[in-house]
Amino acid sequence: MEAACLVRRLGLPQGEEALKARLRRPGHPRLREALAAYLKRLQAPEEVFRALERLEVGAVVTGQQAGLLGGPALTFYKAHTALCLADRAGAAGVFWVASQDHDVEEVRHLHLLRDEVPETLSLDLPPLPSGRIPLAPHRERLRAFLGPWAKDYRLGYALEAETLSEFFARVLLAFLGERGLVPFDPMAEELAPLFLEALERELSDPLGSAEAINREAERIRALGGKPPLRRKPGATNLFLETDQRRLLFYEGGAFTDGVRRYTAKELWEIARADPSRLTPAAGLRPVFQDLVLPTAGFVVGPNELRYVAELSGVYARYGLAMPALFLRAFGVVVEPPVRRILEKYRLDPWAFVDEGEAAFLRAAEAWLAPFRAFRDRVEGLLQEASRLVEEAEALEPNLVRPLRRFRARVRGEAERLRRKLLAAQAARDEVLARHLRRLKVHLLPFGLPQERVYPYAMYALRHGEALRRLAEAPWEGRVALYLG
């Protein structure tokens, strides 16, 4: 079942009216103070500090793993949707930096397209949350890979970060700070203490949220959906970080991470000493987010929408109204060489993203049709010359020899013409192949949609108007951004 359809069938809040109904909800009483301290340390632009004032109205929140150079372009599309909705409601646009995520495979690669060749930097990262991974050991490799772009003042600022998640937050500030985007890193020393009350409550009933998820999963399954978050017996929604981040299980009045056992008191003492060591799993993270932030709207991708749909019971358990849910905008950047190819074949960029080579060949068929029709007419002339010889044999034998000479001349000329046609076809086929390769490299790199591979910061570094075009784009649906 499509995620958006599932959300409608579950009756979950969607749309701007639902967002407006959730404004003026209070966040954590120390939120603005903590965020101001965090942003001051990151030397955020003035527009971001002004956006903090709009937290009194509410927040439209989105988030993503802390990928290199801001991660794939979908990060900026999420931020764009959140900022547009926030502006329309008079609220603040907040970006949750998923610094607690320890799936480093999601964040260790950086793909750039330069001189029509995709280039990849892959960092060897430890299996730790990105908020724990220092940037210093990787800074020079990043600079070398970025080349002349590393001298751009925005990247110079971002590369001063101490951790991978801070690098990500600084990229957001460098490129989207002027629009007032507020990054929020839950592992930042200024912000992690805001979650202590939520952690204490979860430790007091460690299986309650997991049971709520499983009940909702059964409801979704009854509707024909496939819930992604079903919890195993004894699994909590909390991770403990020791030498690595491990899921906690609860049984017989005690917790275990598979290495040792803990009492609730011991875990609480760990959290009080360093609240960033005890972090929520996916089934609890949005709720923890909304216990601290005055979230009125939540911008997600299609896969996120599926798991958020399972969380209504967890929200109810914490006495929270679920925020209004919005799908992010989907984007594809079209640079001048690609635009010329698309226009030549009258091909929509989204058709190529959806269908790839099949869409291109279908569009190219019309371009090849006149060429093929001409070749067929030449073949028809040869066949007509042969038929004339056959008719002459029956009609007048004296016509046979001259018609055979005529046929031979036609055949010779046709053969020469055929060779020229084949050469022209080969050249045209090479043009087609070259155009197809270029479209794939730009729009479907590695067989994936462009927005899931190349960072939008790459386009902003290459085209001065890229950020303006994004700011002017629709906040929802499919958007083609023509640059250059």
Curated annotation (Swiss-Prot):
Enzyme class: ligase
Membrane spanning stretches: none
GO molecular function: ligase activity
Superkingdom classification of source: Bacteria
Residue stretches in coiled coil: 372-435
Known EC number: 6.-.-.-
InterPro entries, A to Z: Bacillithiol_biosynth_BshC, CC_BshC, Rossmann-like_BshC
UniProt KW 4Fe-4S keyword: no
Alphabetically ordered keywords of this record: Coiled coil, Ligase
Family per similarity comment: Belongs to the BshC family.
Name by which UniProt lists this protein: Putative cysteine ligase BshC
Organism of provenance: Thermus thermophilus (strain ATCC BAA-163 / DSM 7039 / HB27)
Chain's gene name: bshC
